[in-house]
Amino acid sequence: IGDLVIGALGKRAATLEVVGDWNHTGVNGEMHALTGAGLFGLATSMSTWLLPLTPIRYRGHVTRADQKVTMRDFVETLPSTTPDAPVILVVGTSMSAGKTTAARIVVRMLAERGLRVVATKLTGAARYRDILSCLDVGADYVLDFVDAGLPSTVCPATRYAAALDHLLTRIAMLKPDVIVAEAGASPMEPYNGATACDRLKPLVTLSILCASDPYAVLGVQNAFQLRPDIVAGPAANTTAAVELVKKLTGVRALNLRDAGAAEELRMLLDRKIVAPLQT
């Protein structure tokens, strides 16, 4: 038979990698591992850049006392509450636009200031690697949508909204000084990113848009009336790109791997996040 593995059935709609859905699985039970973290479904479209996905075959559900076990069985019912800590929101124009890199840099800078930092990934397909990497740079806690019972946020908006409410409640219980929140993919994709951004809008003190190129910055800005504090990612890789972002949108772009730009970000964080917390 081969190895037996446990995962979660779900959907993925990655613009640069894989599209798949467990609902498309045929009677033969053949499907794929849509992520390395155990999101299972039948791949229906895949980038030619990728190696072949791991093929798997459905053998049955995990059960306990003759009842199907689901991720939501392990989500504790909690009284709803909203965090009162400032939120740094990191959004992107697509996947692989530098969001996690930017989040890690921000987390490290805030941790160096002695702040209690919670890092969270609000949307995407289950892959714990991204958010877990924030622990390595000083986050006190990390949480994502999996902790709210979702293997992927490609789901009905009502279901996602309930999961997001639980996630924010969990974060509030940790009493952070500051929250670094990454919205995976982009707000225009079917991961409920727009829902997440709307829900957090009253809490956001600083926003970073990670973009694949300067024109993508303009597209997201126009589509969502989103004016970030700074732009990062490939759209800030060169001085030509930085100048074009400024010309198109009026927003400052920073190559966060550059020492001078990183220092500019640190001063921005000190002014908008650290100083108000110390008063």
Where are the predicted features?
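Walker A (P-loop) phosphate-binding motif
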Residues: 72-125, 236
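Loop/turn positions that initiate beta-strands
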Residues: 1-6
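Conserved catalytic-core segment of NTP-binding enzymes
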Residues: 17-18, 24, 33-73, 157-173, ...
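Short, charged beta-turn/beta-strand-edge "cap" motif at the junction between a beta-strand
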Residues: 9-14, 47
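Charge-biased, low-complexity intrinsically disordered regions
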Residues: 26-30, 74, 79, 112-116, ...
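Short glycine/serine/threonine-rich phosphate/pyrophosphate-binding segments
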Residues: 99-105, 127-131, 187-192, 216-218
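Solvent-exposed alpha-helices and their adjacent loops that cap or buttress functional pockets
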Residues: 35, 78-84, 95, 109-112, ...
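N-terminal phosphate/diphosphate-binding loop that engages ATP/GTP or pyrophosphate donors
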Residues: 108-151, 223-226, 239-249
